[in-house]
Amino acid sequence: MSRKLVVGVPDLTEGDKKQIIEAADRNGFEVEFCTMQEEALPADGEIVFSGSPAFAKNAEKLRWQCSVSAGVNQFKGLPVFENGTALLSNSSGAYGVTIAEHLVMMTLEMLRRQVEFAAAAARKEWLKPLPVKSVYGSRVTFAGTGDIGFETAKRIRAFEPAALYGVNRKGRNPENLFDRIYTQDQIEEVLPQTDILIISMPGTEETFHMLDEKRLALLPDGALIVNVGRGFIIDEAALLPELTAGRLAAALDVFETEPLPADNPLWDCPNLLILPHVAGNMTLPHTREKIVAQFLEDFDNYCAGRPLLRQVDLKAGY
């Protein structure tokens, strides 16, 4: 009986599929490409390449799933991964370029007040110049210094901020890019020194409501929060009054509930840019190509009995 690789990635090009088929042939696998709209997903794959946890729910033969996403919250609680029957890997390292550019865009849109100018343009109203802020001379803190945080910090450095601070779990300073690194349990030390807070941390038990009412209050008046990590990292109920009062501003690509419900008060909140979780995805060709390349690299590793390069520890959350 042949071994099967199931691919559930709707955004692949014919060139991507050709590469996957060639790798499968080389390693003795047959390939089945499926669309996520199918009611009955294949349950006989030894390997699954997809960001959907649906494949793992009734897959007795599954031994490894490679997710196209960097975050893995959707796989928590699935027995096949929790009991060690199957390995799980992600596509961390593929999203740095696209999300870094997205974060720079979100940051500049808020500092340059493009939300207000765009709203005025929709009303056909010609606004007078508004007071703006700059990354130049600002103290910028990155909550998360992995691929996304690191790539963004490299770009932000070019704007000549007063300081670049990093917050991560282990206190490491990648390539000594940051002026100072804080561990997660030291975050309250850096928040009062932060003019712009850029969040790209994964969603874990440790980061749930990491920015609660107490910690939001530590940020200086006029600080900007930019979040592409996970929505629940910020306590939205605590953030709302800070935005409404005009003390803080925020640009959010992720939310505690997605899609954001129509009756959520954030929709009508001032000092806020709302984006519908579009920072990542596979919409940039470079991202898609890197995701496929990383999968093929680990596909060869798996077939040769070597460790996966991007294996996930579900208990840690990344």
Question: Which residue stretches match the model-derived regions?
Answer:
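N-terminal glycine-/charge-rich "phosphate-binding" loop or analogous flexible N-terminal tail
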Residues: 1-45
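NAD(P)-binding Rossmann-fold cofactor-contacting core
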Residues: 159-177
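Rossmann-like dinucleotide-binding domain for NAD(H)/NADP(H)
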Residues: 222-224, 228-318
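Residues forming the Rossmann-fold NAD(P)(H) cofactor-binding site
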Residues: 97, 150-151, 213
